[in-house]
């Protein structure tokens, strides 16, 4: 459903790059546009409760921190170049493919105006195609993505000693 506000004031796009850091495709750059208002960076911690009989509550015990998660809606528009948007969308989803040498998807870097996150692409869901060319090829589309921060054990140990 389209919000009337979005019709009057179209969402501001952000332009970013996804850089492949590891594997056979290291050095590859995938340019993307995203809906700025959907850019969300979150961090979570895990806590457990400690059973203490006779109390009106439960004491919490910190268990571990979780990696940061970056979510957003990517926007694809092929109207200016007469491009079927399924091609650039598949370039993004291909970043989830397992690298045969590493036996895992590649580590990436999401980069946008001074912000950089070393990550993996955890989830990519094609939400919709918004319009099409006369021959039926989709000309605009959106995809919801989630990146999970990727740090090595050594990086996490060094980081925990600094705090």
Residue ranges and their predicted role:
Residues 1-163:
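Acidic, Ser/Thr- and Gly-enriched intrinsically disordered low-complexity segments
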């Amino acid at each position: 459903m389209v919000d009337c506000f979005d019709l009057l004031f179209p969402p501001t796009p952000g332009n970013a790059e996804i850089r492949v850091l590891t594997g056979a495709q290291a050095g590859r750059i995938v340019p993307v546009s995203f809906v700025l208002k959907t850019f969300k960076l979150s961090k979570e911690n895990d806590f457990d409760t400690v059973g203490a009989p006779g109390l009106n509550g439960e004491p919490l015990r910190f268990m571990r921190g979780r990696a940061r998660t970056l979510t957003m809606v990517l926007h694809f528009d092929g109207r200016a170049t007469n491009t079927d948007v399924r091609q650039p969308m598949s370039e993004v989803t291909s970043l989830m493919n397992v690298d045969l040498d590493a036996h895992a998807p590649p580590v990436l870097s999401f980069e946008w105006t001074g912000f950089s996150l070393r990550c993996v692409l955890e989830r990519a869901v094609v939400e919709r195609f918004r319009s099409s060319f006369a021959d039926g090829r989709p000309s605009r589309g959106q995809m919801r993505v989630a990146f999970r921060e990727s740090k090595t054990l050594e990086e996490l140990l060094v980081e925990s000693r600094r705090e």
